[in-house]
From Swiss-Prot:
Gene3D superfamilies: 3.30.1360.40, Ribosome-recycling factor (1.10.132.20). Belongs to the RRF family. It is found in: Cytoplasm. InterPro entries: Ribosome_recyc_fac, Ribosome_recyc_fac_dom, RRF_sf. Responsible for the release of ribosomes from messenger RNA at the termination of protein biosynthesis. May increase the efficiency of translation by recycling ribosomes from one round of translation to another. The lineage of its organism: Bacteria, Bacillati, Chloroflexota, Chloroflexia, Chloroflexales. One of its GO terms (molecular function) is ribosomal large subunit binding. It comes from Roseiflexus sp. (strain RS-1). It holds the Pfam family RRF. One of its GO terms (cellular component) is cytoplasm. Keywords: Cytoplasm, Protein biosynthesis. This is Ribosome-recycling factor.
Amino acid sequence: MVNDVLREAESRMKKATEALRNHLATIRTGRASPALVEHLHVEAYGATLPLNQLATITVPEPRLLVIQPFDANTVKAISKAIMNSELGITPTDDGRVIRLAIPQLTEARRKELTKLVRARVEESKIALRNIRREALEDLRDLEHEKMISEDEHRRAQEKLQELTDRFVRELDHIGATKEAEVMEI
C-alpha cells in the first residue's frame, strides 16, 4: 500500500517534470529548433492540426528553420499560424517552402525569457508540492485506517520527501540549463 502511494507520486512527478521540459522547449533561444514551431496549431482541411502533422521541419543552419508542407495548399495557413503565434518571427515563403530566420535576441528579451523560465520552473515546483501533499494525505488516511503503523507512516514520509527533493533538484537543473541557453549570445 505504501509502495503504491509512493509509486503513484513518483509517476505524477515524472509527468510534471516532462511537462516542464516540453514547455521550456517551446521557449525561443537564439538558436533554431523544431520544437519552437511543431506545437503550433494550424487551421487546415477544416480542422485544427499541429504543424508537425502538416509539414517536415528542418534546421539547415543554426539560425534558420525550414518548414516543408506535405501539401502546398497549406503554406498560407501555416504562415498565418506562425504570424499569429507569440514567437515574434515573420515567415517567408516561396509558395512551397516556408523559411523562418531566427533573429538574435535582445538583452531585454533575454531577461524577459529568463523570468518566464523561472516562473515555469516555480509552477512545476508547486505542482510537485501538491503531489507530495496529496500523497501525504493518502498515507495519513492509511495510518488512520490502521492499515500501516506510525513507524511505516514516518518512513514513507521520509521516502516521499527524498523523492520530492530529487525531482525539485531535477527541475532546478532543467531551469538553469534553459536559462543558460537563453542568455547565451
